[in-house]
């Protein structure tokens, strides 16, 4: 499978919003305006997976000094600090027909590598309980139930700390 990972561009907005709609229930999905703001605010940490010229997935999140995601981060771009300590992951989306083929793994590994190269302390995300094990495979550690109540769902705080070598 020939997948190309690249940085988002403003022209990707429509396809990104469509992928999100396909991947998340309405209560949890980010809207087009959210993505417009994210693309403008932190394009370097918004990666796209493309196959045959079509977006099939993406990963995105701000860079912050926070050690866990809070709901305000999704709406308030002031949490983004270009030289922040932690790379967050707001969403890791892959369209259903392309899942279980390593696309999400490629996206996550690329963002982890990018965060390491930028000198970040680590990465943070929230996930549902059924995905804890998946993220642990990348080295994330479960820090318990999150303060986040985004979409009226129980989320778990996951953090990946980089070694300081």
Language-model features: where?
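A short beta-loop-alpha structural element at the N-terminal edge
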Residues: 2-16
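Short, positively charged
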Residues: 21-30, 133
């Amino acid at each position: 499978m020939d997948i190309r990972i690249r940085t988002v561009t403003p022209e990707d907005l429509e396809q990104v919003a469509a992928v999100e709609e396909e991947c998340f229930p309405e209560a949890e999905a980010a809207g087009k305006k959210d993505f417009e703001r994210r693309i403008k605010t932190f394009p370097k940490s918004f990666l796209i997976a493309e196959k045959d010229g079509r977006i099939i997935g993406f990963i995105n999140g701000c860079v912050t000094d926070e050690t866990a995601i809070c709901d305000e981060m999704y709406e308030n771009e002031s949490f983004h600090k270009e030289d922040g300590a932690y790379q967050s992951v707001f969403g890791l989306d892959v369209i259903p027909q392309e899942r279980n083929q390593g696309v999400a793994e490629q996206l996550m590994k690329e963002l982890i590598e990018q965060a390491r190269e930028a000198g970040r302390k680590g990465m943070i995300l929230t996930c549902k309980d059924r995905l804890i094990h998946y993220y642990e495979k990348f080295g994330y550690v479960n820090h318990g139930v999150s303060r986040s109540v985004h979409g009226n769902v129980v989320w778990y705080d996951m953090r990946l700390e980089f070694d300081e070598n």
